[in-house]
Swiss-Prot record:
Homodimer. Interacts with N-1-naphthylphthalamic acid (NPA). A motif (Dileucine internalization motif) lies at residues 728-729. This is Aminopeptidase M1. The lineage of its organism: Eukaryota, Viridiplantae, Streptophyta, Embryophyta, Tracheophyta. Belongs to the peptidase M1 family. It catalyses: Release of an N-terminal amino acid, Xaa-|-Yaa- from a peptide, amide or arylamide. Xaa is preferably Ala, but may be most amino acids including Pro (slow action). When a terminal hydrophobic residue is followed by a prolyl residue, the two may be released as an intact Xaa-Pro dipeptide. Its main location: membrane. Metallopeptidase that binds to the auxin transport inhibitor N-1-naphthylphthalamic acid (NPA). Required for embryonic and seedling development as well as cell cycle progression. Homodimerization is required to proper localization and activity. May play a negative role in the regulation of PIN auxin transport proteins. GO terms for molecular function: alanyl aminopeptidase activity; aminopeptidase activity; metallopeptidase activity; N-1-naphthylphthalamic acid binding; zinc ion binding. Signal peptide: none annotated. Its EC number is 3.4.11.2.
Length: 879
């Protein structure tokens, strides 16, 4: 039997065709029992059947296999569960005959509190605490609910039957076929599913209300939520029904199931899960309260619903063959969710906001410790770690880059062909490339392999010499060290206006292009500067390519002027800023030049551009403080000046008929001013917060600016005056809206007093905060609170490991607490602490976090060497 241990995949001698699964969850004892009968095709000589199982007790006496066309069931004399490998090995006394037989097993397990497998979530109903039973099987946890072939390529049909209390709602992937009441229990059986992977099977049992609608072709769509919250499901319902219609057209394949249920689960580890026909969500990703949710909450609901519904085609109908190709699922669903959201809400300018996805991808992929989009996965424990910004955000960004290169129409037609060819089966990355190649006639596989099979991305350096534009590519690393790698880079450039545009591929390390031939631009003889109508050259127009651009001084100056005069699109203004920030962090350009560029954004009012500038300002202020404490107040003062214009235009109160984007921007700008200690902002925020304490429905504190007010209150809290902090905790305890709770949690640790930060972190681990939400409390730890947070992490590590250690959330604890540091000593301390405590599922995150500390430390050293920085900051502030 030992020959089956230590293997990444199950042996191929038996293939499941159909599961008949019966489950009986006990929501009071938090246990479940079950039986499964599996139609199993024996395709090779074997005495063994090997399948996945974990955290289950299998009743040995219940195990039997009935060969094809036989009525005699064979018992399995040996039944062994290898816990570490999560496999169940059944050994029979004889070689099993080929063909489809039936394997039967009985088992029982515990409804765990780890938010994976078959688990329990708690909620209150009429003041009483109750349990619901929920499944979360992706990536490899169906095996914790029933023994199965728990790999995405082992697709089968599922016939599910549940035995549950009569007063509860019981949902699964398919519609109910019949219900039989038996005393205070009911037996609910569901229609048999189409062929699908185990990770998409879903069951939810609890008390729920729902709202209902239909798609244009009559498919029933419902949103389920806790009793009394049905109204909060209406927005998601509208988006869901419209999105299913939209994808039916886009993919040229109808939605394959008879119904779509979307349900809000109070305890949920991820944002949402695309189970076929029964999508589960965190409450914050599905529910929208007209009065107390912010515009950003509304947008989050729309994009998450669109993402999960895209998976019904891309992931569920066509499934990746193995987790190496996870990015096909996630990168694609991320990209196409923007397409759907843009179609439903064009005024949100969501494709400009897509840049935030690209930036997150570029940020992670700039690390030595990144990984390729297509990544080897050899153990179930490694899968969790690749649900990261590479699979989702870099994945989505390279799809956007390819669509931009091939054209939208060709891209769409090729995708429809791909889905048609692989429906109800599995695909690898090469299959997608083959479909796009057939549809476009372009060498897509050759073009894209450099982007998916090697990690990292290039920085393209641009300079003008003797009338030629010289481009050179090299791998970009945030550490500033030279990297290996070469890409086929789709270059787009404009000169002086968007009318003059050129696209070409940079296939070698470098190239020189005659500007007159390329764009009709004239360059003064012997000059290396552009002039006349060509006052600027922008490379990577619309940021369509997944790479960075480094301009020489004269090109950079031209772009800075074009930014200030708003001659560039918001997407290009964003790109110039983001590249400049990344190059500064990598010490390829000075902090002085980054700050000079930032001053060109003083009149900026675009939401996406300004919110990125705000994110950059937080980082620069903290790193400046690490380099030189005196510098910190100067840089804060400078950024307050940069944000004043937008703050003045937007004010505190929503204006009649203002845009969704202005509503989101107001909150971000006011939060930044509060964080930087702007006196007027702090006073006004506290005044409005006091009005809110007196009346939760006051118009003085609409949801879009609440976070700003909460952060302002925490800036003033300290150990001798905790009143503001205590008031916020009171609001937290009184609200039952998850979005309000997470908004408060995300503000508490921004307090500059380390004693309060310590209190906040202990509160985060209390029973008052759901395990899924603890990370919000860590997200905004102040510069002054870093050390306290690190000590706390070490002291509480055993508890944190026991509570979150089996899922991906534990990696977020490490990155949130470790990454903000900026000293080599701290990196060493972290390494020493984790030397005996790391596990395979957190190894990559730990290395990435330590690498970020090294990057910060090197950056601090280089800032210390910059001359006249304090004078420059003062000068920029006074302009």
């Amino acid at each position: 039997m030992d020959q089956f241990k230590g293997e990444p995949r199950l042996p191929k001698f038996a293939v499941p065709k159909r599961y008949d699964l019966r489950l009986n969850p006990d929501l009071i004892a938090c246990t479940f029992t079950g039986t499964v009968a599996i139609d199993l095709d024996i395709v090779a000589d074997t005495r063994f059947i090997v399948l996945n199982a974990a955290d289950l007790s299998v009743n040995d006496a219940s195990v039997s296999f009935t060969p094809p066309s036989s009525s005699k069931a064979l018992a399995a004399p040996k039944v062994v569960l290898f816990e570490e490998d999560e496999i169940l090995v059944l050994e029979f006394g004889e070689i099993l005959p080929h063909g489809v037989g039936v394997l039967k097993l009985g088992f029982n397990g515990v409804l765990n509190d780890k938010m994976k497998g078959f688990y329990r979530s708690t909620y209150e109903h009429n003041g009483e605490k109750k349990n619901m039973a929920v499944t979360q099987f992706e990536p490899a946890d169906a095996r914790r609910c029933f023994p199965c072939w728990d790999e995405p390529a082992c697709k089968a049909t599922f016939k599910i039957t549940l035995e549950v209390p009569t007063d509860l709602v019981a949902l699964s992937n398919m519609p109910i076929m019949e219900e039989k009441v038996n005393g205070n229990l009911k037996i609910v059986s569901y229609q048999e599913s189409p062929i699908m992977s185990t990770y998409l099977v879903a069951i939810v049992v609890g008390l729920f209300d729902y709202v209902e609608d239909h798609t244009s072709d009559g498919i029933k769509v419902r949103v389920y939520c806790q009793v009394g919250k049905a109204d909060q499901g209406k927005f998601a319902l509208h988006v869901g029904a419209k999105t299913l219609d939209l994808f039916k057209e886009y993919f040229a394949v109808p939605y394959p199931l008879p119904k779509m249920d979307m349900i809000a689960i109070p305890d949920f580890a991820a944002g949402a899960m695309e189970n076929y026909g029964l999508v589960t969500y965190r409450e914050t990703a599905l529910l929208y309260d007209e009065q107390h949710s912010a515009a950003s909450n509304k947008q989050r609901v729309a994009t998450v619903v669109a993402h999960e519904l895209a998976h019904q085609w891309f992931g569920n109908l066509v499934t990746m063959e193995w987790w190496t190709h996870l990015w096909l699922n996630e990168g694609f669903a991320t990209w196409v969710s923007y397409l759907a959201t843009d179609s439903l809400f064009p005024e949100w300018k969501i494709w400009t906001q897509f840049l935030d996805e690209s930036t997150e991808g570029l940020r992670l992929d700039g690390l030595e410790e990144s990984h390729p989009i297509e990544v080897e996965v050899n153990h179930a424990a490694e899968i969790d770690e690749i649900f990261d910004a590479i699979s989702y955000r870099k994945g989505a960004s390279v799809i956007r880059m390819l669509q931009s290169y091939l054209g939208a129409e060709v891209f769409q037609k090729s995708l429809a062909a791909y889905i048609k060819n692989h429906a109800y089966s599995n695909a690898k990355t090469e299959d997608l490339w083959a479909a796009l190649e057939a549809g476009s006639g372009e060498p897509v596989n050759k073009l894209m392999s450099s982007w998916t099979k090697q990690k990292g991305y290039p920085v393209v350096s641009a300079k003008i010499k003797d009338g030629k534009l010289e481009l050179e590519q090299s791998r970009f690393l945030s550490s500033g060290s030279p990297g290996e790698g070469q890409w086929i880079v789709p270059v787009t450039l404009c000169c002086g206006s968007y009318e003059k545009r050129k696209n070409f591929l940079l296939e070698s390390k470098s190239g020189a292009y005659d500007l007159k031939e390329l764009l009709g631009c004239s360059i003064a003889d012997g000059s290396d500067k552009i002039n006349g109508t060509c006052s600027w050259i922008k490379i990577n127009v619309d940021q369509a390519g997944f790479y960075r651009v480094k301009y020489d001084d004269s090109l950079a100056a031209g772009l800075r002027n074009a930014t200030e005069s708003q001659s560039l699109t918001s997407i290009d203004r964003y790109g110039i800023l983001d590249d400049s920030f990344a190059l500064t962090m990598a010490r390829q350009q000075s902090l002085a030049s980054l700050l000079t560029l930032c001053s060109a954004y003083k009149k900026e009012l675009d939401y996406t551009v300004l919110s990125n500038l705000i994110a950059i300002s937080y980082k620069v202020v903290k790193i400046g403080a690490d380099a030189n404490q005196e510098l910190m107040s100067g840089i804060k003062h400078f950024f307050i000046g940069v944000f004043q214009f937008a703050a003045g235009k937007l004010g505190w109160d929503p204006k009649q008929g203002e845009s969704h984007l202005d509503a989101m921007l107001r909150g971000e700008v006011l939060t930044a001013l509060a964080v930087f200690g702007h006196d007027e902002t702090l006073k006004e925020a506290v005044r409005r917060f006091d009005a809110f304490l007196a009346d939760r429905n006051t118009p003085l504190l609409p949801p879009d600016i609440r976070r700003a007010a909460y952060v302002a209150v925490m800036q003033r809290a300290n150990k001798s005056d905790k009143s503001g902090y205590e008031s916020l905790l009171r609001v937290y305890r009184e609200t039952d809206l998850s979005q309000e709770k997470t908004r408060i949690l995300g503000s508490l640790a921004s307090c500059p007093d380390p004693t309060i930060v310590q209190d906040v972190l202990n509160f985060v681990l209390s029973d008052e905060v759901r395990n899924q939400d603890a990370l919000y409390g860590l997200s905004g730890v102040s510069w002054e609170g870093r050390e306290v947070a690190w000590k706390w992490l070490q002291e509480k590590w055993e508890y944190i490991g026991n509570t979150w250690g089996s899922g991906f959330l534990i990696t977020r604890f490490i990155s949130a607490v470790v990454s903000p540091f900026a000293s080599f000593e701290k990196a060493k301390e972290v390494e020493e602490f984790f030397a005996t405590r790391s596990k395979p599922s957190m190894a990559r995150t730990l290395k990435q976090s330590i690498e970020r500390v090294h990057i910060n430390a090197n950056w601090v050293e280089s800032i210390k060497k910059e001359d006249n920085l304090t004078q420059l900051v003062a000068q920029l502030s006074s302009n």
